[in-house]
């Protein structure tokens, strides 16, 4: 038992560094936070098969880490996308990564779910002006506090992903990168990406905006947000969401909006007992897979076990991800975590057409309405095109 615990502690240290006192250490942490977050999401949403993941531990939390696998071309492509993100991140150009799920391979601009990962950098040396509204900007955060915040964020992502209703059977992934235009060279593109030319996207159903949380260090801050179909939130435990509940906005939302618009979002609560919730769900579901909650893409796996922190990146082109989720029974859906969701039925044997399908049909009849704009800022009276990147090739 002691040996197993020691091994888990060692693996945890491999995922998140124990000490954050230099900008390089902070960069490693932020890169791995991005990798583990993407891994958690893609595993629990059933986007890739088990063979695409390795195993790591965060304290007592067993996580799945995305890796390149010859039997899963999709995971290999996502790993290459992540390497492109790392290139922009280390240059301090990267402002936001948007990982989007869509269902029609011919229409990647109509999305069903998306995940935003935002980055901030300390411009004049290490600062801590983003700790809390209730703390002084002169406050300091210890490495232990940073690691605790990192693990809490991953646990919150895990709980949210496990409780969301399942995605459709067949889904595709795309990724968009946004930059700090004032410092990013106009001709810069990360490996595997090209200049984006899409002005906006359509959300398939009624969107729900969730602010999952953030992790600050003296040199960076990392924030995670999720947008999902409102119907997938029907089985979410009310204790998971913050008491601050506001109406879901139906009007246009800026994908690269600044934090001034955060009051439009629901917040994943910091107050509920994450560990108790996870243990309770393990007992209720009795799933062997739930004992190994999944996360994806830890840096060591992405770099194919290279121990050096050298950030050399392959220049191979990135293709669009197309992958299938597990087959779902017509009367019930089961997520990767083992949780079962009953489908609504009519006449005992036919699925009821969802309001999402009705809304989508109405959109097609009346013309699509752009819900997300990628190229403008919420603080600009006249929207200005902002630089962003997308994968070079689509399948």
From Swiss-Prot:
Top-level taxonomic group: Eukaryota
GO cellular component terms, semicolon-separated: chromosome; nucleus
Biased composition (Polar residues): 344-353
Region (Disordered): 329-395
GO biological process, one term: oogenesis
PTM remark: Phosphorylated at Ser-378 in a SPO11-dependent manner.
UniProt cross-references to Pfam families, sorted A to Z: HORMA
Primary location group: nucleus
SUPFAM superfamilies (UniProt xref): The spindle assembly checkpoint protein mad2
Phosphoserine: modified positions: 377
Keyword Nucleus among UniProt keywords: yes
Localization per Swiss-Prot or TrEMBL: Nucleus; Chromosome
Basic and acidic residues biased stretches: 354-363
Positions of the HORMA domain: 24-226
PROSITE patterns (alphabetical): HORMA
Keywords: Chromosome, Differentiation, Meiosis, Nucleus, Oogenesis, Phosphoprotein, Spermatogenesis
InterPro entries the UniProt entry points to: HORMA_dom, HORMA_dom_sf, HORMA_MeioticProgression
Motif (Nuclear localization signal): 384-387
Assembly and interaction partners: Interacts with HORMAD2. Interacts with IHO1.
Function: Plays a key role in meiotic progression. Regulates 3 different functions during meiosis: ensures that sufficient numbers of processed DNA double-strand breaks (DSBs) are available for successful homology search by increasing the steady-state numbers of single-stranded DSB ends. Promotes synaptonemal-complex formation independently of its role in homology search.
The name this protein goes by in its record: HORMA domain-containing protein 1
Gene this chain is encoded by: HORMAD1
